Amino acid sequence: MKDAHLRIRPLLAALILLSFTAFGAKAQESGNEFLADLHDFRINNYLALDAFYAFSATSDTELLNRVVVGINSANDAMNSVVGSNSGVLSDEQVEELNRSFDSFKDLMRSNINEVRDRGYPDLRLMAELANQGQSMNDTATELYDLARESSGTETNPQVESARSAAVLMAQMMARYAARTHSSVSQTFQGAANEVSLDQQALMFDELLAQARS
């Protein structure tokens, strides 16, 4: 992504703005709380990955704190999803996502310990974390779409565009961090025919325009 270093800071600012947009809508649409929690879960997992890739290259304490904040925020969102009595998703669907998140947290903990103990990452463990993170977030996205369809709640199109843009940008940040700081970037980015970062940037711009319309 040839201009990623120029885009990353504006994208981060946009993520914060879009998150506030979604949270504001949450207060107005009580039936949308379950979706908002799933949204928060996806965002914070990507932010934790983004911070971890940077931490793996520097062992910087501030970056480690960002990882912890991301994981804790995702954990809070997951607890809300698990504790919800909305009935939007089945217990089995929620438990599947929760188990996947438990595996993700375990791998994140192991990877952090490797960096702290040895001063550099274990590439095999990093690849496992990347694969688990991608699988987990794919599942979360599938469940989010299913929850939208089955909840019977009318969602605001602008909020949905904002959420989609925020998740996409958080994913882009994590992918770019993987490319910049580790040799497992291809594992995280997936197959060669996956949408490129440049294409994702165009998709983000389109979603952002829809959110602002």
PLM regions: where:
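Short, charged/polar, low-complexity loop and linker segments
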Residues: 28-29, 50-54, 145-149
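Bacterial N-terminal signal peptides
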Residues: 13-21
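Charge-dense, low-complexity intrinsically disordered segments
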Residues: 35, 61, 91, 123, ...
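Sec/Tat signal peptide C-region and signal peptidase I cleavage site
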Residues: 23-27
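Extended amphipathic alpha-helical interaction segments
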Residues: 118-213
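N-terminal extracytoplasmic segments of bacterial inner-membrane proteins
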Residues: 33-62, 69-72, 104-109, 154-185
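Heptad-repeat alpha-helical coiled-coil/4-helix-bundle sensor or tether segments in soluble regions
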Residues: 65-128, 132-135, 139-142, 198-213
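Bacterial N-terminal signal peptides that target proteins for export
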Residues: 2-12
